[in-house]
Amino acid sequence: TVAIIGGGPIGICCGLIARTAGASKIVVFEVNPDRAASLRETFGFTVIDPTKPGAVAEAIAMTDGLGFQRIYETSASIPGFKMVTALGRVRAHAVIIGITKEPAPLDTWKMMHEEMRLTTIRVHQQYAYAAALELVKSGSLDRELMAMITDEFELADAQKAFEFCLNDTKHIKVLIKS
C-alpha cells in the first residue's frame, strides 16, 4: 500500500512506479482540484484532498486501518510533512523527496514506536537512472508518461511558457520544443 503526498510530476512518477512494482493500493493526496481530476481520470489513482477534515483517517480506512507500507512526500509542504508519520503503519518506509523552504517537523515519537524507516532523496544514484531508463525503454509506461505533458510551447515562446506555468492550475508538465 502506497500513499503519495503531492500529485505533481514526481508524485505521478512515484505512483506509476509503485503500480508497476505491484502496489495493491495507491492513494495520492492533492490539493489542486484540477490536478486531482487528472490524477483520477488520466492515471487512475485514488485521490484525497489533504485539506479536507478526516483526510488521513479516510486514507487509513482504505488499508483496513493498518496504514500505508510506503509513503512518498513529494509536495515539499509543511502540511505534507506532518502527514508522513500519520499515514504510516508499523515498519512503514517513508521517502522524503520534496525539499521544503524551511525546517519541517516530523513525529519522531511515532516513528520510534512504529519502527518506521525514513529515507531522504536529493541526489540520485547511477543505479536509479539505469532502472528508470530500462522502465522507459520497455514502453510499458508510454501512455502515462506522454499524458503528463499537458501543454507544449515553441522555444521562441519560452517566456510565455514560464508565465503559463505560474498562472495555470490545470497543467502537469509543460514541454518547450526547439
Predicted regions and their residues:
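Residues forming the Rossmann-fold NAD(P)(H) cofactor-binding site
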Residues: 12-13
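C-terminal hydrophobic helical "lid"/dimerization subdomain
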Residues: 82-86, 126, 130-178
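Helix-to-beta-strand junctions that scaffold the AdoMet/dcAdoMet cofactor pocket
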Residues: 88-90
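Rossmann-fold dehydrogenase core element
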Residues: 92-95, 106-147
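Glycine-rich Rossmann-fold phosphate-binding loop(s) that bind the pyrophosphate
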Residues: 6-9, 99
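Adenosine-nucleotide cofactor-binding segment
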Residues: 4-7, 19-81
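Residues in the short beta-alpha loop(s) of Rossmann-like NAD(P)-binding domains
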Residues: 31-32, 100, 124
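Residues at the starts of beta-strands that form the adenosine-phosphate
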Residues: 1, 24-26, 93, 117
